[in-house]
């Protein structure tokens, strides 16, 4: 972290979502409940897939890693946010703030890549079923998952590399509930446009690339489904994609609001609300989205419950 002539900032104070004690008490209970559901839902998905051998397929391997990423994503933000509801001020040392930003960006980026990998998996399964075992072999799955985490780490280090070159010598109050890059950038004493544009280009490139993979995959899927003569076949093919499409729409809808829309078109409070949705709410919703409409997941869950009850 760069130094200036004035006192160097050693910690950042997060202003959180609200200063009203009553509102904070209500929000604490709400988000504590959301976090518990997030952990239980995603851990259940991971355990269920690991224990059910018939779910050891590429689609569920990706879903298992998506659940892990959602746990990491939510855990990067929610515990600190919960503390902010119990205290008037929540302070994090500079190293803690850097670590939180690194974790959020890593897991958020990995989620983008995993959603793209899942779209490609659906494309191969529906458009080229005879080549599925070759195109989605265990080796290919390992590469796609590994690239997802590697992409997350590279993007995170882009943010951290720029952040560590900034000087913080004045105000230290971050108008957010976690150490996000944009609010931190506003507090920097040194104003270099390069440190603003590099993370934006990095994130923007990843969003565009993964959206293109998802869009192209679903265009081919739609064309293939429309060519099917059987109504039952169409319904079955489309039903395998609805959960993923729902998750993609929710995640990329909020990400687009934050990173694509002009910052002058929305306020800091709106930014906070949208950030809550994609860092806290979506990780809770994903297990529900992927399990409620999935017969294999529900079937595996029923079998596990029967084993527990009768054992």
Curated annotation (Swiss-Prot):
Tissue: Expressed in the tongue.
Glycoprotein listed as a keyword: yes
Protein family: Belongs to the G-protein coupled receptor 1 family.
Domain of life: Eukaryota
Cellular component, GO annotation: plasma membrane
Gene3D superfamilies with a match to the protein in the record: Rhodopsin 7-helix transmembrane proteins
Protein name (Swiss-Prot/TrEMBL): Olfactory receptor 5P3
InterPro entries documented for this protein: GPCR_Rhodpsn, GPCR_Rhodpsn_7TM, Olfact_rcpt
Organism listed in the record: Homo sapiens (Human)
Disulfide bonds: 97-189
Subcellular location: Cell membrane
């Amino acid at each position: 972290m760069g130094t200036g002539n004035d006192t160097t900032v050693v910690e950042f104070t997060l202003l959180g979502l609200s200063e009203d004690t009553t509102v904070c008490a209500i929000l604490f209970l709400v988000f504590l409940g959301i976090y518990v559901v997030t952990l239980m839902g995603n851990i259940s998905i991971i355990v269920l897939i690991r224990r059910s051998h018939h779910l050891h397929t590429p689609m569920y391997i990706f879903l298992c890693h998506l659940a892990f990423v959602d746990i990491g994503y939510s855990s990067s933000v929610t515990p600190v946010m919960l503390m902010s509801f119990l205290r008037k001020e929540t302070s994090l040392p500079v190293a803690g703030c850097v670590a939180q930003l690194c974790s959020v960006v890593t897991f958020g980026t990995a989620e983008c890549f995993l959603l793209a990998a899942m779209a490609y998996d659906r494309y191969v399964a529906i458009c080229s079923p005879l080549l599925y075992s070759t195109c989605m072999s265990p080796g290919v799955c390992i590469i796609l998952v590994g690239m997802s985490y590697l992409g997350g780490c590279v993007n995170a280090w882009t943010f951290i590399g720029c952040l560590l070159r900034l000087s913080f010598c004045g105000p230290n109050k971050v108008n957010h509930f976690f150490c996000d890059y944009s609010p931190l950038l506003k507090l920097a004493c040194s104003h270099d446009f390069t440190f603003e544009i590099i993370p934006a280009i990095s994130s923007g490139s990843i969003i565009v690339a993964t959206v293109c993979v998802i869009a192209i995959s679903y265009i081919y899927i739609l064309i293939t489904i429309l060519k099917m003569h059987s109504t039952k076949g169409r319904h079955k093919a489309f039903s395998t994609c609805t959960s993923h499409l729902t998750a993609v729409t929710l995640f990329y809808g909020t990400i687009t609001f934050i990173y694509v829309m002009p910052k002058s078109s929305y306020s800091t409070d709106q930014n906070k609300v949208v950030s809550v949705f994609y860092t806290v709410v979506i990780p809770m919703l994903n297990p529900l989205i992927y399990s409620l409409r999935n017969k294999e997941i529900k079937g595996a869950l029923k079998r596990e419950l029967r084993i527990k009850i009768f054992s």
